[in-house]
């Protein structure tokens, strides 16, 4: 202290430093208070927002509807609080540069006053419920870089003025309700690299300026109504386009060659359009391409050999086109391929052995083509293969045991000469007692030793001998025909004498001897009269195989056609019990049930059932095995759904019978596309073990109700579940045996409806009719989901389904006309009189 008194200047120095420290602390405290006063957590440069920006934000708030209270911070306080406390607002030097309010539940509209935010760079309001139009004033914002308005309810057209934003880089207006054409001016921004306008209702052509943009790396226009040809993609130098998605539109014409010259392309999808012509071979020169989808078009020609050069390709989907020719042998060069879908084309030749070299492949679908030969053994080495389908080809031979154990029978159906894929379709045992069939090697050796040139005399003698043999064969055939005709005339004379008794017998059945073949033929009613010999000597054509047996189309000698089902041996009940059950089935008559006309018991235990022949085949083939040019309108689909429902309701209410195996394959269609339920009651003819196998097969095809895993018994409610699956099949065009994204058909439909994308459920063909039948489609979908409710008690009765379908679409005079039999005839009166 004494020292300080001695040095007064030291006192002044200490006082000065103390005051300076206090002033610095005060300034720091003041700055911190201003910066943190709003409590909004946003950084702020300390400059107050301009009055124009403040008024614009107030106008924006006024037109938005704040359902969740997120805009409470946008109060009427001074403009000094905007940048530091208002939710979703970011500023720079007193100017609003970003509005970020995604997933906030905001409704209302976007004010045109947003154009007053002259420094706005980013507008992010996606995943809300905002309606109205896209503000035209966005085109005034010269600093705008990103617009994210996807997943809202915006309508109207895309403003042309957006092309006036020179710095715009990302424009995403997807998943709205926008209409009109795509403005060609959008690509006037020299920095636009990402454009997403998918899932709207845009129409008109794809602007040439968009296709020829020098800056776009991502272009997604899927699920719109765009039409016309795809313009040439200008290629002169380096173009950065990596992703192109144009699927689910109405583009026509050929795939432009110039598109396949964008060397940086990684993903191309142009599925579900109307493209034609062939695939350009230049598409095989894209070194970075990972996914290529040309499915559901009318593309023809062959798969280019150049595709084997796509070394980065992971997924190739060419489903539902008109491609022909073989699969290139060098396909195994696609080392990264995990999915190959060539379903529903006209591709022929053998399945290449080289596919077995693609070790990473997970999904392989070659169904509904013209492949021949055996299934290559090399496919058993594909350890990652989880989805495999070669059904409905012309394959032959045994299925490799590894594949038959790993995949169910639906993967191999429709190949008549294929065997070993299920217990009901075993391969025949090898025959060790061959007839005189020489192998190529053994037949050539003797010819080398005994070969000599035939003389003219030898040739004449051989020709005369052959002619005599042919004449002798013709005489034998004529003699057999005369004998058969006389026998038939005698039988007809006998029938004429007893015709009155036959008519009075009605559906009770009339038995006749088996003729020369033996056995017993029992007729119910029907338009045709034939003998056992006529039936057994008819020209037969296999229509399909099932757990019950093999179905044939039989053409009788007089040209009439019937359907014959040969039941599998050792699966049916004893003769006495069998006849009692089959006689009861022969009495059932309804316009939507396939009528049993006769049955035959052979001398060796064979059992044949005779039905009306349905010219249009099964509903499954009608829906899934047609070409893209064959359209099925909603009127026809609803007619089929009503017919199935009526037939099932009659079985439940009038016959007290459960079908137990209702599938689209068991719904047959006549010439007028009337539905006839087949295979009802056949389980009553089977042993208990065989009937259980039938129900298990129905489950593998996706028609089995979930409660089967516990109760193991069929009921009227399990039939209604199967009916619901078939109605979903009619609505979606999808087969229930083909899982979508790992979900079965009801789960997939429910997931789409839950996301409020209900229109995505319906078959693309039906979407063209939505303006006239949109309500019918939605109401039928609700009914189908009711039928497939996991709880049996929640499902309606079959007769309730009939009533609701008739309420959804009342009958017209045309729809009420029915065709009694597949081939017409007198039987129409019988069916009409027996209808209840």
UniProtKB/Swiss-Prot annotation:
Ranges of the Cytoplasmic topological domain: 480-836
Annotated family: Belongs to the protein kinase superfamily. Ser/Thr protein kinase family.
CDD domains listed in its UniProt record: STKc_IRAK
Tissue: Expressed in meristems, including roots, vegetative, inflorescence and floral meristems.
Binding positions for ATP per the UniProt entry: 543-551, 565
Record's keyword terms, sorted: ATP-binding, Cell membrane, Glycoprotein, Leucine-rich repeat, Membrane, Nucleotide-binding, Phosphoprotein, Receptor, Repeat, Signal, Transmembrane, Transmembrane helix
Cellular component GO terms held in the UniProt record: plant-type cell wall; plasma membrane; plasmodesma
Free-text note regarding domains: The protein kinase domain is predicted to be catalytically inactive. Lacks the conserved Asp active site at position 661, which is replaced by an Asn residue.
InterPro entries: Kinase-like_dom_sf (IPR011009), Leu-rich_rpt (IPR001611), Leu-rich_rpt_typical-subtyp (IPR003591), LRR_dom_sf (IPR032675), LRR_N_plant-typ (IPR013210), Prot_kinase_dom (IPR000719), Ser-Thr/Tyr_kinase_cat_dom (IPR001245), Ser/Thr_kinase-like (IPR052451)
Protein name stated in the entry: Probably inactive leucine-rich repeat receptor-like protein kinase IMK2
Ranges occupied by LRR repeats: 119-142, 143-166, 167-189, 191-212, 215-237, 240-261, 264-286, 288-310, 312-334, 336-358, 360-381, 384-406
Organism annotation: Arabidopsis thaliana (Mouse-ear cress)
């Amino acid at each position: 202290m004494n020292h300080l008194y001695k040095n007064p200047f030291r006192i002044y120095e200490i006082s000065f430093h103390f005051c300076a420290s206090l002033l610095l602390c005060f300034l720091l405290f003041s700055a911190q208070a201003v910066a943190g006063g709003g409590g909004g957590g946003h950084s702020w440069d300390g400059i107050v927002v301009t009055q124009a920006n403040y008024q614009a934000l107030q106008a924006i708030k006024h037109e938005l509807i704040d359902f969740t209270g997120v805009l409470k911070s946008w109060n009427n306080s001074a403009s000094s609080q905007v940048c530091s406390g208002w939710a979703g607002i970011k500023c720079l030097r007193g100017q609003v540069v970003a509005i970020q309010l995604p997933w906030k539940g905001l409704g209302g509209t976007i004010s045109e006053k947003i154009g007053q935010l002259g420094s706005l760079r980013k507008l992010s309001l996606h995943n809300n419920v905002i309606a109205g139009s896209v503000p035209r004033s966005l085109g005034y914002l010269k600093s705008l870089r990103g617009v994210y308005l996807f997943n809202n309810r915006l309508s109207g057209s895309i403003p042309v003025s957006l092309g006036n934003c020179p710095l715009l880089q990302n424009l995403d207006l997807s998943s709205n309700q926008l209409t009109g054409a795509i403005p060609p001016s959008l690509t006037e921004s020299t920095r636009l690299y990402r454009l997403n306008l998918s899932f709207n209702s845009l129409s008109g052509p794809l602007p040439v300026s968009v296709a020829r943009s020098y800056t776009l790396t991502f272009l997604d226009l899927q699920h719109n109504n765009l039409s016309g040809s795809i313009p040439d993609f200008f290629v002169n130098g380096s173009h950065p386009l990596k992703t192109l998605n144009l699927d689910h539109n109405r583009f026509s014409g050929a795939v432009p060659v110039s598109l396949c010259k964008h060397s940086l392309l990684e993903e191309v999808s142009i599925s579900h359009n109307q493209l034609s012509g062939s695939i350009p071979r230049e598409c095989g020169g894209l070194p970075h391409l990972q996914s290529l989808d040309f499915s559901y078009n009318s593309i023809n020609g062959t798969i280019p050999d150049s595709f084997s050069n796509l070394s980065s390709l992971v997924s190739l989907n060419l489903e539902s086109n008109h491609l022909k020719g073989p699969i290139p042998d060098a396909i195994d060069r696609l080392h990264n391929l995990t999915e190959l879908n060539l379903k529903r084309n006209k591709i022929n030749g053998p399945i290449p052995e080289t596919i077995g070299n693609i070790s990473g492949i997970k999904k392989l679908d070659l169904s509904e083509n013209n492949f021949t030969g055996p299934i290559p053994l090399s496919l058993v080495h594909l350890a990652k293969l989880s989805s495999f389908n070669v059904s409905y080809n012309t394959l032959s031979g045994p299925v490799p045991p590894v594949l038959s154990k790993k995949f169910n029978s639906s993967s191999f159906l429709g190949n008549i000469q294929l065997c070993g894929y299920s217990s009901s379709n075993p391969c025949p045992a090898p025959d060790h007692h061959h007839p005189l069939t020489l192998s190529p090697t053994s037949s050539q050796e003797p010819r080398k030793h005994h070969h000599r040139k035939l003389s003219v005399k030898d040739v004449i003698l051989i020709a005369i001998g052959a002619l005599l043999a042919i004449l002798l064969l013709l005489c034998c055939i004529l003699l057999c025909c005369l004998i058969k005709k006389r026998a038939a005339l005698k039988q007809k004379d006998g029938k004429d004498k007893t015709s009155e008794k036959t008519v009075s017998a009605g559906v009770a059945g009339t038995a006749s001897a088996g003729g020369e073949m033996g056995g017993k033929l029992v007729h119910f009613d029907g338009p045709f009269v034939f003998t056992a010999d006529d039936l057994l000597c008819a020209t037969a054509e296999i229509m399909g195989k099932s757990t019950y047996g093999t179905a044939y189309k039989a053409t009788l000698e007089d040209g009439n056609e019937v359907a014959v089902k040969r039941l599998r041996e050792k699966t049916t009940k004893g003769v006495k019990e069998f006849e009692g059950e089959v006689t009861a089935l022969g009495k059932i008559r309804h316009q939507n049930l396939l009528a049993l006309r006769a049955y035959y018991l052979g001398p060796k235990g064979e059992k044949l059932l005779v039905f009306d022949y349905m010219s249009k085949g099964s509903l499954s083939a009608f829906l899934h095995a047609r070409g893209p040019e064959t359209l099925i309108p909603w009127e026809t689909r609803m007619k089929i759904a009503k017919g199935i429902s009526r037939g099932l309701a009659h079985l439940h209410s009038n016959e007290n019978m459960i079908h137990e195996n209702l599938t689209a394959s068991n719904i047959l269609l006549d010439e007028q596309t009337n539905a006839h339920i087949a295979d009802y009651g056949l389980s009553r003819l089977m042993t208990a073990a065989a009937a259980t196998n039938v129900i298990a097969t129905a489950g593998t095809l996706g028609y089995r109700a979930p409660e089967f895993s516990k109760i193991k018994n069929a009921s009227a409610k399990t039939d209604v579940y199967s009916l619901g699956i078939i109605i979903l099949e009619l609505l979606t065009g999808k087969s229930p045996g083909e899982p979508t994204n790992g979900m079965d058909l009801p789960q997939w439909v429910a997931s789409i409806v839950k996301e409020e994308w209900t229109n995505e459920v319906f078959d693309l063909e039906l979407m063209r009719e939505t303006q006239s039948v949109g309500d019918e489609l939605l109401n039928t979908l609700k009914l189908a989901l009711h039928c497939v409710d996991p709880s049996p008690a929640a499902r309606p009765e079959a007769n309730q389904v009939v009533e609701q379908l008739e309420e959804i679409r009342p009958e017209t005079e045309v729809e009420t006309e029915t065709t009694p039999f597949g081939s017409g005839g007198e039987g129409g009166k019988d069916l009409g009189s027996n209808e209840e």
